[in-house]
Amino acid sequence: MNIFFLSADPEEAAQMSCDRHSIKMILESAQMLSTVLRQHGYDGDTYIYGQTHVKHPSTIWAGKTRANFDWLLSHALALCREYTYRYGKFHKSEEILYRCGELREQYIPAGSLT
């Protein structure tokens, strides 16, 4: 579970990602965002991933403020676009990411990027 912060711009960071990371980081980001939502009280039956790596520094950072959550979500969706561009297909975690985005305002505390 990592976040490769290659640029402050999440789109540029996705484009700079190597092939291996452009594939792997989509799933890891979706897992982190799902974990953060569950840690902040989401327990609905709408499908997102279960909790994992709850004490990992990247997961803790993502859940600290909505701006952190939003950066990771934007980066993960940019990685999805990059994945489609490079490989001509859609990543299975993309729909999870959109669902995380729909839930964010209700569960993630407001705050600036840290």
Segments predicted by a language model, with ranges:
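Aromatic-residue-lined binding/catalytic grooves and analogous aromatic/hydrophobic interfacial grooves
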Residues: 102-114
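An N-terminal structural lobe/cap that precedes and organizes the functional/catalytic core
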Residues: 1-86, 91
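Secondary-structure junction/capping motif
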Residues: 91-95, 112-114
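A glycine-rich phosphate-binding loop feature that marks nucleotide/adenosyl-phosphate handling sites
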Residues: 95-102
